[in-house]
Regions:
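Conserved tyrosine-mediated DNA breakage-rejoining catalytic core shared by Y-recombinases
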Residues: 1-50
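Short, basic (Lys/Arg/His-rich) helix/loop patches that form interaction surfaces
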Residues: 38, 52-67, 73-113, 117, ...
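DNA/chromatin major-groove-contacting recognition/catalytic segments
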Residues: 18, 22-28, 125-145
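Ser/Thr-centric signal marking residues that sit
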Residues: 31, 96, 122-126
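Short, flexible helix/strand-to-coil boundary loops that buttress conserved ligand/catalytic motifs
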Residues: 8, 52, 124, 139
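Hydrophobic side chains within well-formed alpha-helices
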Residues: 44, 72, 120-123, 138
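A short, basic/aromatic helix-end/turn motif that makes direct DNA contacts
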Residues: 1-4, 112-118, 128
Length: 145
């Protein structure tokens, strides 16, 4: 909980949680730019305030989400099959977040910063296919000159 400043609406990304040999291990982020601050939207701050208020003795050392991605695998698989939709991985939510940001016109540089990518080439190489083809827009713009 200490990595979230609800008053300032900021999440400080300073570490990474890895699962190694059935143990949770906290490590530094993979890259220098992996250490970053993420500004949180109002709706998420409200959700976090509500969630944290339900945790007994929540303090700066409290790990807010004790669940592991491994423990989500089987329920996700089961309910995806019931709903007859493709199963998504937790990491796919990150991909969806980027797709939404692109759709809303957020610049690739801002997205790279938010994701903690050291180089914009990583962002564009991974998510470049999500950018809409703007050739018609460009031609129309040039027609106005």
């Amino acid at each position: 909980a200490g990595d979230i400043d609800l008053d300032e609406q900021i999440m400080h990304i300073t570490k990474s949680l890895q699962r190694m040999e059935r143990q949770d291990v906290i490590t530094p982020p993979k890259t220098r730019k992996g250490i970053r601050d993420i500004t949180l939207p109002n709706f998420l701050v409200k959700e976090l305030e509500n969630y944290m208020s339900m945790i007994y003795d929540c303090n700066g050392e409290t790990r807010l989400f004790e669940i592991s991605k491994q423990s989500l695998y089987y329920p996700m698989k089961k309910y995806s099959e019931i709903a007859r939709v493709p199963r998504i991985r937790i990491h796919d939510i990150r991909h969806s977040h980027v797709a939404l940001l692109i759709e809303k016109g957020v610049s690739p540089l801002a997205i790279a910063e938010r994701l903690g990518h050291d180089d914009i080439k990583i962002t564009l190489g991974t998510y470049g296919h999500l950018y809409p083809n703007k050739q018609r827009e460009i031609a129309d713009l040039l027609n106005t000159l």
